[in-house]
């Protein structure tokens, strides 16, 4: 989404919540997602004019988020064990507890995917980006994006073999 932005403050005010949600989904942890966004925004602020001049601050910051997450994972102590992440809160559907439970179970499965596959799934199905945009963010070819997506969906189908649900297709 290309947004006409005048100032850094205006951008953060309008797009900040979406960046936090994206980081939360990529990292699988709300607090880590918030930390990633703070880090990315603090690094983006001094070069904001150049970022806006590039024409797509959303794409630039998405890539910064992905790169920051990958760097964090590399630096993380090998003794830490992922706990499966926080629940992704539902915006509504209080009457549909089964649907909410299904969504929570799916996010727990997505959090078990390897980082590149999880990032690809989030960018494809949450951010609704095409292969070329995802490839630009991940600095790889569109074919690699399709491979990550296919492997992630295959893994999710194996981990959650419910043929009655066609949410993955």
Question: What is the predicted role of each segment?
Answer:
Residues 1-21, 31-34, 45:
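A short, charge-rich alpha-helical start-of-domain segment used by transcription regulators
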Residues 2, 39-56, 75-77, 159:
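Sigma70-family region 2
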Residues 10, 105-113:
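Short amphipathic alpha-helical boundary/capping segments
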Residues 19, 23, 33-44, 61-64, ...:
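Short, small-hydrophobic-rich alpha-helical interface motif
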Residues 46-53, 63-84, 93, 98-99:
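Arg/Lys-rich amphipathic alpha helix in sigma70-family domain 2
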Residues 100, 110-118:
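Short helix-coil-helix linker/hinge
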Residues 120-124:
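A short pre-motif secondary-structure segment
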């Amino acid at each position: 989404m290309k947004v006409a932005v005048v100032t850094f403050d205006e951008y953060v005010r309008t797009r900040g919540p979406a960046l936090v949600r994206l980081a939360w989904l990529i990292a699988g942890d709300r607090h880590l997602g918030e930390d990633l966004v703070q880090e990315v925004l603090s690094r983006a602020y001094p070069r904001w004019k150049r970022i806006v001049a590039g024409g797509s601050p959303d794409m630039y910051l998405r890539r910064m988020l992905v790169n920051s997450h990958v760097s964090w994972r590399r630096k993380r102590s090998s003794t830490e064990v992922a706990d499966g992440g926080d629940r992704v809160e539902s915006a509504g559907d209080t009457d549909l507890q089964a649907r909410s439970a299904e969504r929570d179970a799916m996010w727990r499965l997505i959090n078990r995917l390897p980082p590149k596959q999880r990032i690809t799934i989030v960018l494809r199905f949450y951010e609704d980006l095409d292969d070329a945009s995802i490839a630009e963010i991940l600095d790889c070819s569109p074919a690699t994006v399709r491979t990550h997506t296919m492997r992630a969906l295959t893994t999710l189908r194996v981990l959650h073999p419910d043929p009655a649900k066609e949410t993955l297709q």
